[in-house]
Amino acid sequence: MANIVSNEKTYRHTQKVRKENHAKMSKLRTIVKKTRSSNEQAQLNEAYKVIDTTASKGVIHKNKANRLKSRTAKAFKANLQVVA
């Protein structure tokens, strides 16, 4: 651990941000998994919202967000065709 006060504060802040980012990523993964096996349009819209929010907060890159949305929509559409 750091011996300088400002470094200790930075360490505490970093740990706090790390926990927040981990929670956001966990929520993102959970909703994407649920959406891919779902057949409700509202679920897909919620996934888009979470993905965009996570990207805007800087947790994931915007290109990764777009890729996730595309792949989630593709899996969602395939699931709809199987159910129908």
From Swiss-Prot:
Keyword presence, Ribosomal protein: yes
Cellular component aspect of the GO annotation: small ribosomal subunit
InterPro entries linked: Ribosomal_bS20, Ribosomal_bS20_sf
Keywords in alphabetical order: Ribonucleoprotein, Ribosomal protein, RNA-binding, rRNA-binding
Organism superkingdom: Bacteria
Gene3D superfamilies attached to this UniProt entry: Ribosomal protein S20
Molecular function GO terms recorded: small ribosomal subunit rRNA binding; structural constituent of ribosome
Chain positions covered by the region annotation Disordered: 1-25
An individual GO BP term: translation
Pfam families listed in its UniProt record: Ribosomal_S20p
Family per similarity comment: Belongs to the bacterial ribosomal protein bS20 family.
Described function: Binds directly to 16S ribosomal RNA.
HAMAP family given in the database record: Ribosomal_bS20
Protein name, per record: Small ribosomal subunit protein bS20
Organism: Ureaplasma urealyticum serovar 10 (strain ATCC 33699 / Western)
Encoding gene, per UniProt annotation: rpsT
